[in-house]
């Protein structure tokens, strides 16, 4: 296990997670931001790419497992992503199966991954790169303390897909935390 939250466990994906991964990656509603549901081969490639990331980088997209059921309901984690001009940045990415939507799981997992990126991996800034039409994921990024700071266009299956680059810096979260402590102290006076 990599991370644990109140309701979720995040762990490395295993080959046995393939059926659960397919529930997400082959669902056209879940994959609307990609404009393409994955084939079996694409889903296997996705799974094995995460496993290569674990070995190479020490992180990747992890299986999101619901504690109450023990079922894999999504993926969330940290990956290196291009943000233009040959610049790479750690990204907090998330994707959940439809049955896990509207439960706060994406925010819960994304916040845990953001904190892991800062506190364990030592990154000073993380991003989430989100399609311009993916409002639910943008809302998760905002709840994760992120603000849009740039744009890029990804080319996927012959299509140009505009994306927003949401970021948060460690110092911004620390400042927000201290402001909350100060506000709490003032409220008690």
Regions found by a protein language model. Name each.
Residues 1-33, 65-189:
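Acyl-donor (CoA/ACP) binding surface of acyl/acetyltransferases
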Residues 29-49, 60:
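Conserved GNAT-fold acetyl-CoA-binding loop/helix
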Residues 49-51, 152-153:
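Short, P/G- and charge-enriched loop/turn segments at secondary-structure junctions
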Residues 53-58:
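Short loop/turn motifs at secondary-structure junctions and domain boundaries
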């Amino acid at each position: 296990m990599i991370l644990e939250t109140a309701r979720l466990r995040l762990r490395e994906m295993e080959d046995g997670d393939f059926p659960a991964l397919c529930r997400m990656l082959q669902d056209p509603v879940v994959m609307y931001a990609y404009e393409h549901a994955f084939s079996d081969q694409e889903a296997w490639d996705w799974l094995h790419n995460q496993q290569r990331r674990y070995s190479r980088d020490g992180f990747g997209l992890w299986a999101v497992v619901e504690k109450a059921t023990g079922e894999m309901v999504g993926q969330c984690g940290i990956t290196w992503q291009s943000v233009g001009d040959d610049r790479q940045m750690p990204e907090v990415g998330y994707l959940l199966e439809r049955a896990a939507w509207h439960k706060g799981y994406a925010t819960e997992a994304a916040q845990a991954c953001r904190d892991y990126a800062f506190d364990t991996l030592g990154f000073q800034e993380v991003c989430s790169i989100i399609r311009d039409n993916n409002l639910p994921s943008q809302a998760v990024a905002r709840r994760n303390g992120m603000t849009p700071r740039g744009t890029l266009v990804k080319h996927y299956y012959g299509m140009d897909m505009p994306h927003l680059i949401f970021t948060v810096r460690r110092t911004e979260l620390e400042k927000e935390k201290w402001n909350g402590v100060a506000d709490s102290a003032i409220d008690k006076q």
